[in-house]
Swiss-Prot record:
Catalytic activity: RNA(n) + a ribonucleoside 5'-triphosphate = RNA(n+1) + diphosphate
Domain of life: Bacteria
Region (Disordered): 69-90
Cellular compartments per GO CC: DNA-directed RNA polymerase complex
UniProt subunit comment: The RNAP catalytic core consists of 2 alpha, 1 beta, 1 beta' and 1 omega subunit. When a sigma factor is associated with the core the holoenzyme is formed, which can initiate transcription.
Organism: Vibrio vulnificus (strain YJ016)
Gene that this polypeptide is encoded by: rpoZ
InterPro entries xref list: DNA-dir_RNA_pol_omega, Pol_omega/Rpo6/RPB6, RPB6/omega-like_sf
EC numbers for this chain: 2.7.7.6
Function statement: Promotes RNA polymerase assembly. Latches the N- and C-terminal regions of the beta' subunit thereby facilitating its interaction with the beta and alpha subunits.
GO biological process terms, semicolon-separated: DNA-templated transcription
Pfam families reported in the protein's UniProt record: RNA_pol_Rpb6 (PF01192)
Keywords assigned by UniProt, alphabetized: DNA-directed RNA polymerase, Nucleotidyltransferase, Transcription, Transferase
Descriptive protein name: DNA-directed RNA polymerase subunit omega
Length: 90
C-alpha cells in the first residue's frame, strides 16, 4: 500500500479546504455512486483512494464537475425519452 501524504495532494489542488471537498466528493462517488477507482484499490478505503487519485493528477474539481454535468445530461435525456415514449403510447 502506497503511503499518501496530504501535502502532495494539497500541492495538486492548491489548499487544504478544496482538497477536503474534492476528496470527499470523489470518495462519495466511489462509495455510493458505484464509480470505479482510477488507481489500484489495494484494500484502501474510498477516502485514501480519492487522495491517491488527486495526488496522481487524475481527479480535479474540473474533472468532477464535467463528469457530473455529463451524467446529469444523460439522465435528463433518458427521462425525456421515457416521457416521450409514454406520450406516444397514449
Amino acid at each position: 500500500m502506497a503511503r499518501v501524504t496530504v501535502q502532495d495532494a494539497v500541492e495538486k489542488v492548491g489548499n487544504r479546504f478544496d482538497l477536503v471537498l474534492i476528496a470527499a466528493r470523489r470518495a462519495r462517488q466511489m462509495q455510493t455512486g458505484g464509480k470505479d477507482s482510477l488507481v489500484p484499490e489495494e484494500n484502501d478505503k474510498p477516502t485514501v483512494i480519492a487522495l491517491r487519485e488527486i495526488e496522481e493528477g487524475l481527479i480535479t474539481k474540473e474533472v468532477l464537475d464535467a463528469r457530473e454535468r455529463q451524467e446529469q445530461q444523460e439522465q435528463e435525456a433518458a427521462e425525456l425519452a421515457a416521457v416521450s415514449s409514454i406520450a406516444r403510447n397514449r
